[in-house]
From Swiss-Prot:
It comes from Mus musculus. May play a role in lipid transport. GO terms for molecular function: lipid binding. Keywords: Lipid-binding, Transport. InterPro entries: Calycin, Fatty_acid-bd, ILBP, Lipocln_cytosolic_FA-bd_dom. Transmembrane segments: none annotated. Highly expressed in adult retina and testis. Belongs to the calycin superfamily. Fatty-acid binding protein (FABP) family. A fatty acid binds at R107, R127, T128, Y129. The gene is Fabp12. It comes from the Eukaryota. This is Fatty acid-binding protein 12.
Amino acid sequence: MVDQLQGTWKSVSCDNFENYMKELGVGRASRKLGCLAKPTVTISTDGDLITIKTKSIFKNKEISFKLGEEFEETTPSGRKSKSTVILDNDSLVQVQDWDGKEATICRRLVDGKMVVESAVNNVTCTRTYQRV
């Protein structure tokens, strides 16, 4: 499944992103900038190491990890979290834990597009990406 997600993807649609960021505690100005961003995501592998690079006008971010192994990351909003990524059916599922809270980011292929669903509490954001 990771092989199918490898490559470069450009954001083509976004639903409920501002509310998702608000639920994360992101300030108003950063939420507005984040909503304007049309990120490009590149997913690659080197053996069992997976790297996800996200580039936008707002911020750039890179994480590298092995499936099932916890790692530390700093999110674009500045949160420091412990994350674990697993392969669940046809989805790459990332769980971020910080300060007793949890967010889930699920990446999967739907009709040739990468769909990323991010959820915290009862707020879900869906971003759709097209292969570049």
